[in-house]
C-alpha cells in the first residue's frame, strides 16, 4: 500500500483539489521551478503541448495555477462545476504523476534552458521560459538582497539557495539531474493530496487510487526536511550592478533579518501567555 497523505472536507460551495510535494533543492539551478513548468507541458493521458493553457481557455475553473516555494511545489485547481472539476483534477494528477517531460527532453529545453543561434554570425545566447522569467525577477535589487540574506543565514541548507533558479546557475542543470530530482520527489509518499468541497470524497479517492496511486510501490521512505540552523555570523557586504544612468552615491541597500521558530510554535507560545 502507498501511504500518501490524503485530506478531505465537504464544506465549500466550490470543489477544490491540490497536489503538493516536498521539494527542497540543493542548488540554485531552478530544478523545482522547471519541473513545475514542464509537468504541465503534456502527460500520458493528455499529450498536448500546453494542456495548462487549454484549461485556462476552455474550463470553468475558479482557480487554476501552480507554484514553487522554498521547500514545496503545489498544483491547486477549483471549479463550481462537478464535471469540470473532475477533468481539472484528472489533468493535474496525470501531469504530476505521468508527465511527458521525463521521457522527452523537449519540454525541459523549452521551459528550462537551451542554447539559441538564429544566424551563424550571431552570438550564442541562452533562452528558456524559466530562465527568462528569473532573469526578470533577479534584476530587482530587492530580490537580490533577499537571495543574499537567505544564502548567508542558511549557508549549508536548501533554504540558502534560490528554489526558483538563479540565471547564473540554471544553465548548469542537466536533463539527467532534472529527471533524477523528479523521480525522487514526485512520489505519492512525498505528496499531500487535498480534496475540499461539497463532493463525494470517497468516489474521488477511489478514482485517485485506481488511476494513479495503485501503480506505485511503497518505499517506506517519506522525505523529511530538517529544520535549518541559521548562522550566527550575520555581518556581510556585497556589491550589486547598476545601470550607466544610475549613481553609486545614495544607492545602497541594507537588510535586517531574524530567524524565527515555526509559526505553529509562535502561536502556541502566544496562546500560553
Model-predicted regions and their roles:
Residues 1-7, 11-13, 270-273:
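Short, small-residue-biased leader/transition segments that mark boundaries at the very start
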Residues 29, 33-37:
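Active-site recognition of the HExxH zinc-binding catalytic motif
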Residues 81-83, 198-201:
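Helix N-cap motif at beta-to-alpha junctions
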Amino acid at each position: 500500500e502507498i501511504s500518501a497523505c490524503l485530506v478531505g472536507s465537504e464544506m465549500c460551495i466550490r470543489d477544490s483539489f491540490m497536489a503538493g510535494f516536498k521539494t527542497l533543492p540543493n542548488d540554485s539551478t531552478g530544478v523545482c521551478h522547471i519541473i513545475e513548468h514542464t509537468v504541465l507541458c503534456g502527460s500520458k493521458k493528455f499529450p498536448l503541448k500546453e494542456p495548462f493553457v487549454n484549461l485556462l481557455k476552455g474550463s470553468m475553473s475558479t482557480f487554476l495555477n501552480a507554484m514553487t516555494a522554498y521547500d514545496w511545489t503545489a498544483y491547486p485547481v477549483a471549479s463550481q462545476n462537478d464535471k469540470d472539476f473532475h477533468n481539472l483534477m484528472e489533468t493535474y494528477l496525470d501531469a504530476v504523476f505521468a508527465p511527458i517531460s521525463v521521457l522527452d527532453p523537449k519540454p525541459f529545453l523549452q521551459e528550462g534552458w537551451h542554447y539559441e543561434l538564429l544566424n551563424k554570425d550571431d552570438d550564442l545566447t541562452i533562452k528558456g521560459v524559466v530562465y527568462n522569467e528569473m532573469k526578470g525577477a533577479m534584476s530587482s535589487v530587492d530580490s537580490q538582497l533577499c537571495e543574499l540574506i537567505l544564502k548567508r543565514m542558511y549557508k549549508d541548507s536548501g533554504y540558502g539557495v534560490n528554489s526558483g533558479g538563479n540565471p547564473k546557475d540554471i544553465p548548469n542543470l542537466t536533463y539527467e539531474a532534472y529527471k533524477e530530482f523528479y523521480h525522487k520527489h514526485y512520489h505519492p509518499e512525498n505528496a499531500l493530496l487535498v480534496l475540499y468541497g461539497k463532493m463525494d470524497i470517497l468516489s474521488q479517492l477511489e478514482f485517485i487510487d485506481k488511476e494513479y496511486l495503485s501503480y506505485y510501490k511503497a518505499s517506506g521512505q517519506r522525505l523529511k526536511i530538517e529544520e535549518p540552523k541559521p548562522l550566527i555570523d550575520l555581518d556581510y557586504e556585497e556589491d550589486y550592478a547598476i545601470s550607466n544612468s544610475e549613481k553609486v552615491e545614495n544607492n545602497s541597500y541594507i537588510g535586517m533579518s531574524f530567524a524565527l521558530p515555526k509559526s505553529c510554535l509562535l502561536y502556541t507560545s502566544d496562546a500560553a501567555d
